[in-house]
Amino acid sequence: DGFYYSVDLNLLPVEKPDIESLQPGTLYLHVGQPRTYDCLIQRLSVWSGFMSMWAGIATPEQAKEMVQRHFHDTLSYNAPAGIRTLSPLEKMYDTRASGNPSSWQGPVWINVNYLVFRGLVQYGYTEEARELAEKTILLLGRDYERFGALHEYYLPDNGEPVLNKGFQNWNLLVLNMAAWLDEKEVISEF
């Protein structure tokens, strides 16, 4: 679907193997570790699937598939406040406040909105880019109006701030979104 990239991995038995039994050119993961949930590779539907568009490495076909199947999917990524960091269809979806580590299990982050926005622009999806830019500007505008400051991340469905009032950092990327909407020069981020 243009969203996932996989690598074949082999898991060895729990016991450490003899060095002679290792196969050349084979990648062994977690040698000697017990098989538990947290040591297994999982395919999760997370926002970083859009990164190939931002990086410019997605083919036009992959980009089209991502936009159609993932960006436009309001049950998965496209929320009223922006892009969810994890699809709510995943079991670990959770928007509770968490500061250590910060919650990347569903809330909307401005840097994520921005990177997806830039990918959309790069591949010519201007209508979708405009939609995401407008959502992001509205989200931060409401936050500043209500609280006099910006927050680190937000609830996807209603835009309520979650944690860290006064957070600026990548929230300022919204200025590039506003400049793009106004057809002004956008500052190069890298």
Which role fits each region the language model picked out?
Residues 1-108, 141-190:
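Extended glycan-interaction surfaces of carbohydrate-active proteins
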Residues 9-10, 125, 134:
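An acidic- and aromatic-residue-enriched active-site/binding cleft used to recognize and process polar
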Residues 48-60, 113-126:
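Alpha-helical support elements that line or immediately flank enzyme active sites
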Residues 67, 132-133:
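Inward-facing hydrophobic residues that define packing positions of alpha-helical scaffold repeats
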Residues 121-131, 182-190:
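Beta-rich accessory regions
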Residues 137-138:
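Amphipathic alpha-helical segments of tetratricopeptide repeats
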